Amino acid sequence: MPKIQKQISALYTSAVLGNFSLTGAWVAILTARGFRLVEIGIAETVFHITSLLFELPSGIMADVFGRKRMLIVSALMQLMGNLVMMFSRGLVSVCISMSFTALSYNFSSGTGDALAYDSLKSAGLEGRYEKFQSNLMTIYRLCGGLSTLCAGFALALGYKIAYGTGLVSQAMQICVLLTLREVMPDRPRQTEPILSKFSACIRESLSFLHTARKALCIMFCNSLVGALDTVLLFFLQAKLPARGIPQQELGAALLLMELGGVVGARLILHLSRWDYPSVFLTAAALVAAGFLAEHAVAYPVMVLGGFLSALGDDALQVRTNALLQGMFPSQQRATLTSVESFTFSVIMVVLSPLAGILFTYW
């Protein structure tokens, strides 16, 4: 039990170091640097195209080479992204930075979840995974909210110093990740060549997806809601100042919207009797309300809409992750979790440029 607690605590600490930064309101920072919303939409599209290309390979690498190693690679990619952004001058260098950041997400998405679930499963505690996911989503939202709260501070410091602090965070994160214990399912093919392991992982994952159509449907529903919430919150960073919110209140408003996700992640733990369709429909309705609130004359209504959207998104995310992890076989857990992230990226590649145009002219 103490070893499991140490393992889970290290994953929580890594999540804090990987998600808290002075540059959380990166859309606002780019806007302040003179980038247009359409350009920001292009940068976001590059991010998701990179995710699209490397999401599945990164998941397979985690299942073949080890989850701990890929989490360390993830931190290194984030470090490179911050370094490039520090010296960026135009859209091209910003896009390169976004690509490194996308790779960071690729190597961590699914990998940490797989390591956590198999760690809990090895101790017979897999029933606690939904609580782990709730805590993790709370960390993500709180770190994201606190990061955006630092928006004014980051703008005052300058983007170079702001991104420079991320280099320190990633170095600390790597030190924490080195303390993790690798937990991999027993494999009968440990002596097989690497290419054989890759092909076997792909073949078995495809076989699972072919027979588990329900899992694919769940992935799509969750990714669609998550993508809509993501683009809404991203562009509200730029729309709120245009609607008249005082600069000193922007960080607090962005934090409040992120706290909606915290409420959703905690609330879903008390709704165990709700079936998945009920959770999905409620989450979709809350995100739709957020989009409608974006047109409100008063910016507090826009903030409330963002809060409700985040609430629905994270409640659905926690329930989805717990449901899917219980369905996935351990040997392909990271790969199959990456399929969900891949689905999200496909939707975001389409939505990001459309949202940039939509929020500019609508």
Predicted regions and their residues:
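Transmembrane alpha-helix termini and helix-breaking/packing motifs in multi-pass membrane transporters
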Residues: 32, 85-87, 144-165, 169, ...
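Cytoplasmic helix-loop-helix junction between adjacent transmembrane helices
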Residues: 98-141
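Helix-loop boundary and gating motifs at the non-cytosolic
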Residues: 2-53, 212-255
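C-terminal transmembrane bundle of multi-pass solute transporters/carriers
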Residues: 43, 68, 234-362
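Helix-loop junctions on the cytosolic side of multi-pass membrane transporters
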Residues: 159, 163-193
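Conserved MFS/SLC helix-loop-helix module at the cytosolic interface between two early adjacent transmembrane helices
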Residues: 52-89
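C-terminal ends and interior cores of transmembrane alpha-helices
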Residues: 76-90, 285-298
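Juxtamembrane intracellular "pre-TM" segments in multi-pass secondary transporters
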Residues: 1-5, 181-218
